[in-house]
């Protein structure tokens, strides 16, 4: 089978390389290309949808603000009452302002469609609603500040009055001890007693949890032991005295009594006349002389 050789010659007349002078390949993307008219139509539809959404949002926000203002005016306890102004009740001055704004409007452009502008009437309604909300917030803030000031003043007055009363009652309270409150005295135990007390408390708490014994308990376990402890002599700090300490105390008491008897015996008595003693002095001689005639009369 004969083979044909294909050769390419350079065409220098056109000034373009022959290798690069091929027709464009069909990649299949031509059907997905969109014309400029279709793009403009899509952008215009998108801008219209966004404008409608913005208008709906502004209307909903205005209605919410008016409802909030009405609720705040109902809840306010002050004398000043704020009324919600409907958006269709506009004065003549406001209409004049709207005309002046239509003649010289402030240009507000959107991002997608810069030729569209906001509605001046809509902007006026938004400004009215914002002014009402600002007034309401100012009134509420003033009321809160006044309430806070009054509460602070009352608290300061109460604190000063309480401090003055405490200063007046302190010196009396320091000297007077209420009889209803008993004085807590410390008690001393050795190591064996200490561990025994802990063991007893643990067992009692366990029984109280199981509701086997009542939680109300006496300050002592056994009445006889309590009486015996109350009779025992105590030393410094409420500690019980030992037998040696008790014997020494008895010896000191006996020595004190011996010294008193020795002084009474050996110190001479003062010679004091009865006239120098206080009180009326009775004369025994006169009493005897009075008794004699009575005896004579009785004998006669």
UniProtKB/Swiss-Prot annotation:
Chain residues forming the annotated DNA-binding region: 218-243
Positions of short motif Subunit association domain (SAD): 188-211
Key words of the record: Activator, DNA-binding, Nucleus, Transcription, Transcription regulation
Biased composition (Basic and acidic residues): 36-68, 284-300
GO cellular component: CCAAT-binding factor complex
InterPro entries: CCAAT-binding_factor_CS, NFYA
GO molecular function: DNA binding; DNA-binding transcription factor activity
Pfam families recorded: CBFB_NFYA (PF02045)
Polar residues bias locations: 69-80
Region (Disordered): 1-81, 247-300
Subcellular location per the Swiss-Prot or TrEMBL entry: Nucleus
Protein family per UniProt: Belongs to the NFYA/HAP2 subunit family.
Biological role: Binds to the upstream activation site (UAS) of the CYC1 gene and other genes involved in mitochondrial electron transport and activates their expression. Recognizes the sequence CCAAT.
Subunit structure: Belongs to a heterotrimeric CCAAT-binding complex.
Stated name of the protein: Transcriptional activator HAP2
Higher taxonomy: Eukaryota, Fungi, Dikarya, Ascomycota, Saccharomycotina
